[in-house]
């Protein structure tokens, strides 16, 4: 069993071409990816279903069922670099008049020697950048929110032939 991994060394990639319909893994793999530079933080993503409940007179316990799933709204925080190609793509999709979905690829640094890393693929609309305030010791940052419109596709590590 592999040792546990931290987020250090993980990478975020984006695609400049809009992806407005659900994709399968092979379609994501075929896209042209641009790495986003100076990523400092990636927010939560993944299936988060609503929990619907209904009380009936004949049941002593509230009855529950899953409802609609939210794929997530992760924030991508970057140290602002005006000419970073990945950040430029994020800014382009973040324009309030841009209603297209952007494809995103998140690669963990967890495969180890002789293996690929875990990869997540998804797509969604982008909001931002938000420019956080701060003081004299704070970096100039930008935050983008990705409203995912497809459940992430997880690709586990495999042995490199």
Where are the regions a protein language model picked out?
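Hydrophobic beta-strand residues in large extracellular and virion-surface proteins
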Residues: 12-14, 104, 146
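Short beta-strand and beta-hairpin "edge-sheet" elements
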Residues: 107-154
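Solvent-exposed edge beta-strands and adjacent loop segments
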Residues: 2-77, 125-138
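A structural detector for beta-sheet-dominated domains
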Residues: 15, 37-40, 79, 107, ...
């Amino acid at each position: 069993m592999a040792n546990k991994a931290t987020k250090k060394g993980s990478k975020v990639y984006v695609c400049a071409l809009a992806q407005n319909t659900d994709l399968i893994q092979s379609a994501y793999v075929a896209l042209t990816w641009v790495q986003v530079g100076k990523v400092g933080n990636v927010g939560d993503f993944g299936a988060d279903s609503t929990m619907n409940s209904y009380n009936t007179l004949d049941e002593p316990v509230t009855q529950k069922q899953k409802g609609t799933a939210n794929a997530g709204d992760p924030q991508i925080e970057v140290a602002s670099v005006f000419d970073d190609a990945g950040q430029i793509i994020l800014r382009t999709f973040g324009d309030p008049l841009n209603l297209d979905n952007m494809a995103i690829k998140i690669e963990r640094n967890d495969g180890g020697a002789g293996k690929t890393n875990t990869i997540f693929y998804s797509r969604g609309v982008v909001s931002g950048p938000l420019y956080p305030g701060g003081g004299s010791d704070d970096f100039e940052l930008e935050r983008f929110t990705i409203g995912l419109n497809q459940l992430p596709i997880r690709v586990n590590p495999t042995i490199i032939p």
